[in-house]
Amino acid sequence: MFGRDPFDSLFERMFKEFFATPMTGTTMIQSSTGIQISGKGFMPISIIEGDQHIKVIAWLPGVNKEDIILNAVGDTLEIRAKRSPLMITESERIIYSEIPEEEEIYRTIKLPATVKEENASAKFENGVLSVILPKAESSIKKGINIE
């Protein structure tokens, strides 16, 4: 057969539309585990729960460390960042790009436990933000003795 399969362009368009949708408007997600996430822009995250802490990992390509703001209070973590525009010279022009233009992105995450925000730590390396939030004593599971 000569040329492209006609389904290639259909699937390519569907793929782009599917992944572009969460990048444009404000979204709200509630997981089956009760975690609520709202936000805007492209910021994939993972939430990992340990016995003593909660770890949130956010993928932030194209973001500088100085352009990230973190706030935690109670059982909520907020991540805000600003993605810089592509740097091109006057003699260049963008003819196609899937990389978002300059944008402000954020996530507000209702965590599965109350955290000690004053003991939280974060690091940003190779476009990946890792935030570790120790659980508050009242959120740590404790065994109950039966008499």
UniProtKB/Swiss-Prot annotation:
Belongs to the small heat shock protein (HSP20) family. Keywords: Chaperone, Cytoplasm, Stress response. Coiled coil: none annotated. Homooligomer of 24 subunits. Forms a spherical shape. GO terms for cellular component: cytoplasm; protein-containing complex. GO terms for biological process: protein complex oligomerization; protein folding; protein stabilization; response to heat; response to hydrogen peroxide; response to salt stress. This is Small heat shock protein HSP16.5. Residues 36-147 form the sHSP domain. InterPro entries: A-crystallin/Hsp20_dom, HSP20-like_chaperone. Disulfide bonds: none annotated. Chaperone that confers thermal protection to other proteins.
